[in-house]
Amino acid sequence: MVMTKKVIFICGASHSGSTLLGLILGSHSACFYAGEVNKIQFLNIKKEHEDKSCKICGRSCPIWGNFILDKEFGLYKQLSKLTNKPIIIDSTKKIAWLKKQSNKLEIYQSKYLIYILRDGRAVINSQLRKYKDSDPEELIEKWIKHIKSTDDFYYNFSGKKIQIHYEALSSKPEDIIKKLCNFLEISYEKSMSQYYLHEHHPLGGNTGTHYLIIKAQKDNKKIDSPIQLSERNKYYYLDHPLEIRLDLRWKKELSEKIIKIFEKKAGKLNKSFRWND
């Protein structure tokens, strides 16, 4: 039986590229990207929920389809046993979950933390696109609160840790992937950047990024994805190449009014997140 040797946590704000990063790392032969693992709470509920199943193959998923957590055995050990992978990747954003799970790891399990940074203006734009009736000021306040708590978690994390920019990953994927492989002490595999050609079983995460896998593997009969592109995302992802590409839509979509509000409330905090204005 394969045992969990490493657990990689990916933290950051929502809509910061953690799904892309998780899928890239999960394309390594030794890794399994589980997605936002805290979504296991929705797997066995009776009512319908968007996070009730694997984002790629739906309820027939060989990993999550009949998954029942064995609390005695351990969550990540259970996933290693199911997938035959010694390295498990969890991109849950909730800090309470990350603290709990990182503290529960056994002494022989190494823990790593990757903090993915993305310009806060891009994050707010993505959130407004998804939640179009939201109050921009409320979203900005939530971003500030989450970033501060994530910064605190990162500062106090006792395992190996690193920060990377989504924009750097998307602009120079090979360089950043090699850097992360070195950090994680695993060999670099060239096919990792072609994550859309690999088998994946993530919970939660970005619908658009998952859609590119479905698009690339349209003839794979095992895929029965429950995801649907929103009207506001269709134009972007239907014509999106499979290759990794930097998303700077916020520069065209985010109004000057909202940018000014963001700068007033969060400009100082966003300094380390800004990307080549």
Which residues make up each language-model segment?
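Short, solvent-exposed loop/turn segments at secondary-structure junctions
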Residues: H15-S16, N38-I40, K94-W97, R118-V123, ...
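PAPS-dependent sulfotransferase catalytic core
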Residues: M1-G74, L79-L82
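Acidic-histidine catalytic/liganding microenvironments
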Residues: H28-S29, T92, L105, F157
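PAPS-dependent sulfotransferases, especially Golgi type II membrane carbohydrate sulfotransferases
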Residues: M1-I8, D151-Y154, I186-D277
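PAPS-dependent sulfotransferase catalytic domain
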Residues: I68-G74, L117-Y196, G204-N206, I213, ...
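Conserved phosphate-donor/acceptor-positioning beta-strand/loop module used by diverse small-molecule
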Residues: D90-K94, Q101-L128
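Hydrophobic/aromatic beta-strand patches that form the interior of the parallel beta-sheet core
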Residues: I8, F32, Y112-Y115, I162-I164
